[in-house]
Amino acid sequence: GVGPRYCPSIETKVDIGVHNLVSPDLAEICFDLGKLDDAVTILADSNEQVVAEKLRSLLRIGAASTRYKDVFDIYYLLCKKGVRERELDDAVRALVIEDPTMRERSYGDIANRLSRVFGDRRFKRELSRAKNNWLEISPDKVTSAITAYFS
């Protein structure tokens, strides 16, 4: 037979962003389409760019944020995967510290804001829900590590 149920498929999720890149350091990822003798290539932001963008969103929205998974993503990229410190500093400066629309003007400001956000009761409760914690690591450990990183 022919049709969708006989065609192999791979489900994926792609986050499409339209923004000014801090760094032109994009990773080129190629997906081989097998029997079609073709491939699809996408460009992916660096880990540093992703951390800076997720951090910016968290700082901007604060405890009202509902993007709890981003907290675990930031932790993973900073503490498990690793980032290049200079490139992260460049991205954080461009997207947060030097952006006139942001309130944070230093790493101290960032750490203070993160402490307030992570200390909010509702935010802590939602962050601790299992579906948000794809790393299965204590939310307190995650938030402490992120705050310490930017201190």
Task: State each model region's role.
Residues 1-151:
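Structured mid-to-C-terminal alpha-helical surface segments
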